[in-house]
């Protein structure tokens, strides 16, 4: 999933940066968690170590491991899942739904040119009461005494004889959500939205500082992502780092790399990041250019400047060949190009400060051995918050100017998806105000008796259940109320 080839490109070009993500003392850093993406990664890691664990036991083991790290690093997770909190909602919005709806409407490329390119309105843009959240339980609602729920669907049909098989992932979805809710963690009922889309909404409404996921399509939606929280310095990818490296604006980035989205292009019809850049005759910055960019970042660290105005698209020329001219102009004038300093949450001293050459393979001083005055962290944190507020993506609708009129099914799918992303992340003007609707956040009252009941009901071995419960009580203390965390992080 994501943008095909983006992760490899980011690693190769040193765009994966390691950061401490240490907020000032007394603060929690809010982070959206694409729960199934993260849990699948952990399940693959741990289920081979514990082959005797059943689905619920391995799920709880991964959950305990994840919650312990969140507590250690003062991260405040807001969990986001596909198909709602009951794992039963059909997904009718997002990339997969757009592809399915478009291919059902158009059988041939000739039909695509006559079809409306607008996607259906999402719950975020719908002015009516959102039907996507109609099944949400009220805060503090407990499960019925006999409510055992149903387990997530098992693995699909077995692979043909002789075909390479992947190990079945032992992840109990509904059990995982119920434990998190009983422990009092904040969550989003994505309803009929994909989890990626809900995470992007939390990021662009300045609710979270990062999205914890390995899906690079969040970068296409303008988000900064965290790849792994278990390491000392956390590997991250900033969307603005990509834009500065590519020498392009966000609308250009969205319109160009939508071709790489794997969910929009079935049967390997997507383009890779390298292929798209090669078609545009893009060349990577030299080391001297990277050093100059780093010096500009340091010189401009106290004053953020706006990105240069885009050249208007030539009238009557709506093919992707115009990208070659645009990028050639930007590369030719790169000595005069002034990047904004990168936006990132407060980092710790001793971490990689040179944004141009930082690498995920660097040997860094462990964060716990680095002493930074709290006053310095507070100042850096305030600078980060001010920068995030100034850099709201207002120009996302300009991406449509860089797309040709859809003449094929693939182009129609891309056009609809770009419009859909714009509806998710671009604020709307309401008189003197610019507003972006945030999805509702829910947080049930912590009920340790309920959590214990859920665990012991599904994990029948008493010793295993007791061990996991002891880990939960030790490493997953009662989380703060999400409104207090967000107010302190963004408003103080």
From Swiss-Prot:
Q: Name one Pfam family in it.
A: XPG_I
Cite the entry's keywords alphabetically: Decay of host mRNAs by virus, Endonuclease, Eukaryotic host gene expression shutoff by virus, Host gene expression shutoff by virus, Host mRNA suppression by virus, Host-virus interaction, Hydrolase, Inhibition of host innate immune response by virus, Interferon antiviral system evasion, Late protein, Nuclease, RNA-binding, Viral immunoevasion, Virion
Could you give a GO molecular-function term held by this entry? RNA binding
> Site annotation (Necessary for the endonuclease activity): which residues?
215
Please tell me where this protein is predominantly located. virion
Is this entry keyworded Nuclease? Answer: yes
Signal peptide as annotated in the record = none
Keyword Plastid attached? no
Q: Which GO terms describe its cellular component?
A: virion component
Question: Which stretches of sequence are listed as region Disordered?
Answer: 110-130, 288-307, 334-371
Tell me its EC number(s), please. Answer: 3.1.27.-
Give GO terms for biological process: symbiont-mediated degradation of host mRNA; symbiont-mediated suppression of host gene expression; symbiont-mediated suppression of host innate immune response
Q: Where in the cell is it found?
A: Virion
Q: Which domain of life is it from?
A: Viruses
Database matches in InterPro entries: PIN-like_dom_sf, XPG-I_dom
Assembly mode: Interacts with human EIF4H, EIF4A1 and EIF4A2; interaction with eIF4AI and EIF4A2 presumably allows Vhs protein to associate with the eIF4F cap-binding complex.
The text of the family note is: Belongs to the herpesviridae VHS protein family.
What biological function has been recorded for the protein in this entry?
Minor structural protein that acts as an endoribonuclease during lytic infection. Degrades host mRNAs in the cytoplasm by cutting them at preferred sites, including some in regions of translation initiation. Together with inhibition of host splicing by ICP27, contributes to an overall decrease in host protein synthesis. Also, after the onset of viral transcription, accelerates the turnover of viral mRNA, thereby facilitating the sequential expression of different classes of viral genes.
Q: What is this protein called?
A: Virion host shutoff protein
Source organism of the structure = Human herpesvirus 2 (strain 333)
Q: Output the lineage of the source organism.
A: Viruses, Duplodnaviria, Heunggongvirae, Peploviricota, Herviviricetes
């Amino acid at each position: 999933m994501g943008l095909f080839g983006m992760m490899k490109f980011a690693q190769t070009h040193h765009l994966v940066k390691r950061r401490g993500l240490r907020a000032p003392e007394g603060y929690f850093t809010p982070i959206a968690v694409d729960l199934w993406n993260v849990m699948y990664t952990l399940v693959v890691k741990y289920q081979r170590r514990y082959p005797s664990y059943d689905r619920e036991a391995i799920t709880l083991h991964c959950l305990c491991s994840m919650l312990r790290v969140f507590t250690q690093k003062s991260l405040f997770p807001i969990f986001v899942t596909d198909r709602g909190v009951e794992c039963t909602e059909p997904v009718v919005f997002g990339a997969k739904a757009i592809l399915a709806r478009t291919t059902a409407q158009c059988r041939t490329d000739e039909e695509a040119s006559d079809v409306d390119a607008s996607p259906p309105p999402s719950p975020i843009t719908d002015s009516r009461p959102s039907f996507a959240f109609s099944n949400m339980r009220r805060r503090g609602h407990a499960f019925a005494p006999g409510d055992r729920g149903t387990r997530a669907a098992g693995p699909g049909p077995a692979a043909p004889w002789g075909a390479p098989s992947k190990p079945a992932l032992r992840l109990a979805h509904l059990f995982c959500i119920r434990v998190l809710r009983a422990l009092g963690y904040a969550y989003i009922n994505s309803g009929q939205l994909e989890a990626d889309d809900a995470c992007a909404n939390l990021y662009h409404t300045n609710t979270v500082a990062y999205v914890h996921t390995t899906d690079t399509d969040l970068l296409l939606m303008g988000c900064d992502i965290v790849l792994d929280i278990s390491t000392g310095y956390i590997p991250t990818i900033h969307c603005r780092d990509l834009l500065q490296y590519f020498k392009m604006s966000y609308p250009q980035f969205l319109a160009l790399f939508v071709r790489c989205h794997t969910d929009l292009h079935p049967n390997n019809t997507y383009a890779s990041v390298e292929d798209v850049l090669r078609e545009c005759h893009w060349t990577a910055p030299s080391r001297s250019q990277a050093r100059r960019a780093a010096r500009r970042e340091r010189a401009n660290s106290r004053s953020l400047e706006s990105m240069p105005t885009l050249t208007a698209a030539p009238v009557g020329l709506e093919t992707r060949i115009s990208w070659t001219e645009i990028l050639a102009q930007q590369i030719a004038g790169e000595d005069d190009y002034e990047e904004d300093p990168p936006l990132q949450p407060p980092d710790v001293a001793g971490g990689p400060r040179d944004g141009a050459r930082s690498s995920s393979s660097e040997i860094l001083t462990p964060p716990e051995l680095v002493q930074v005055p709290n006053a310095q962290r507070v100042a850096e944190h305030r600078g980060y918050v001010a920068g995030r507020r100034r850099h709201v993506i207002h120009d996302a609708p300009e991406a449509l100017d860089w797309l040709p009129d859809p003449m094929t099914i693939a182009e129609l799918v891309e056009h609809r998806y770009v419009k859909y992303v714009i509806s998710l992340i671009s604020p709307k003007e309401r008189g003197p105000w610019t507003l972006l609707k945030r999805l509702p956040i829910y947080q049930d009252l912590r009920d340790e008796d309920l959590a214990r009941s859920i665990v012991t009901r599904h994990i029948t071995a008493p010793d295993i259940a007791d061990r996991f419960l002891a880990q939960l009580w030790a490493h997953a203390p009662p989380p703060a109320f999400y409104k207090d965390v967000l107010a302190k992080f963004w408003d103080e």
